[in-house]
Amino acid sequence: MTRLRKFESVFGENWVVGRYLLPALEKLGRAHTGVVLDLACGESPFRKCFPYARQYLRVDHDPLDAEVIRGDMRCVPLPDRSADAVLLCQAITDVPEPSAVLKEVRRLLRAGGSVIVFESMCYPEHDAPHDYFRLMPEGLRAVADTVGLQVRECMRLGGLFTRFASLWNTCLMGGLMRYRALRPIGLLGVAAGNVFCYALDRMAPHPRLASDYLAVLAPRDAALDLDSPASGSGN
């Protein structure tokens, strides 16, 4: 299953997160008509969220196709002011020094540009040994401030049961799904857990228990501090 399908399919492990993330990211993406740079792009699951981008550049340390630029997020092989928008989805916590990533992003950003950051506050351990920490919204603010960036908007996504769905699905994916004969049961368990947890989250939203967040950063002199602590809405 591709990474995007994990967000879109009810049988995907990130379906509940996707119900909040995809509408919010698509709304932001439609406003970008210039050059979008996707760092640590992987399978480029969010490319379709930027339908009007004039150019969609992708960088990854281990490219999956020939169009992806090979490079480290801390030293991207592109000239200064290459992008109008930079996308960082669950990326900056995969390096031991996130400030180095944001400093490089600041170099790549054109005047009037913005940085879109998606991070999870409770995602299970992944990509070991390159999974260093979970960066809370205030942590992102603090790191961004050191390189001249400011959080312009921060949307908290999901809630307590989004967290539960993430852990439940990780257990199923790492347990039943390893055995071919049990995969149908595992997939049904994932789907049932997704629907149940999403319904509970919608009935009892609690922003302080949000599982993820989507933030927009801009150079400090161009940013307004418009933090939005309310939980993001899904379809």
Predicted features along the sequence, with ranges:
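Conserved N-terminal segment of class I S-adenosyl-L-methionine
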Residues: 1-80, 85-89, 210-213, 220-235
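Short catalytic micro-motifs in class I SAM-dependent methyltransferases
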Residues: 90-94
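GHKL-family ATP-binding catalytic core of two-component histidine kinases
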Residues: 77-79, 96, 136
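S-adenosyl-L-methionine-dependent methyltransferase catalytic module, highlighting the catalytic core
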Residues: 99-100, 104, 114-235
